[in-house]
């Protein structure tokens, strides 16, 4: 593992780190698994239960919440946000919700996919192998392998035959 000289890197003991992982400053990692040869930029949070495959790049200001799996060779651009709750609420009956009131909905990003900067991925979807998500897209449903999508909501622009 290689840590930059930048201050404040919070890496909890529960994190499983692979070989040759590069982590830059102002990161917050806990309860996640990080594969070999991964680069994690500044101001990134990766929550418990998330899995990052080998040779992935997670660019700065990205939020990877519980339930997200990135397979090998995935690129995540700057300021990408994943979600894991279909109906987020602080309260439903006037009482602050607890973790018991919440169910994590997982998201899978398959091998070689690329997520453009500023994209938001809603939970419960699969991004297919080698798919490309355009910058600023809001992805609300599955993206087929090899497809390029963009927009809000994201729509298929091209598909590999």
Regions found by a protein language model. Name each.
Residues 2-13, 25-125, 152-153, 160-161:
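Flexible, glycine/small-residue-enriched loop-and-beta-strand segment within the central core
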Residues 125-142, 146-148:
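C-terminal/domain-terminus segments
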Residues 138, 153-156:
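Conserved switch/coupling elements of ABC/ABC-like ATPase nucleotide-binding domains
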């Amino acid at each position: 593992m290689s840590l930059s000289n930048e201050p404040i890197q919070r890496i909890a003991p529960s994190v499983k780190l692979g070989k040759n992982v590069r982590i830059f400053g102002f990161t917050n990692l806990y309860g996640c698994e990080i594969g070999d040869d991964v680069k994690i930029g500044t101001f990134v949070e990766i929550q418990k239960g998330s899995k990052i495959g080998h040779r992935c790049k997670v660019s700065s200001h990205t939020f990877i919440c519980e339930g997200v799996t990135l397979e090998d060779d995935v690129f995540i651009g700057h300021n990408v946000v994943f979600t894991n709750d279909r109906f987020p609420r602080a309260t439903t009956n006037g009482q602050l919700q607890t973790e018991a009131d919440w169910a994590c909905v997982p998201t899978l990003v398959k091998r070689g996919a690329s997520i453009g900067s500023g994209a938001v991925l809603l939970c419960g979807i699969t991004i297919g192998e080698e798919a490309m998500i355009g910058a600023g897209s809001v992805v609300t449903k599955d993206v087929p392998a090899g497809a390029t999508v963009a927009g809000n909501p994201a729509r298929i622009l091209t598909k590999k035959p």
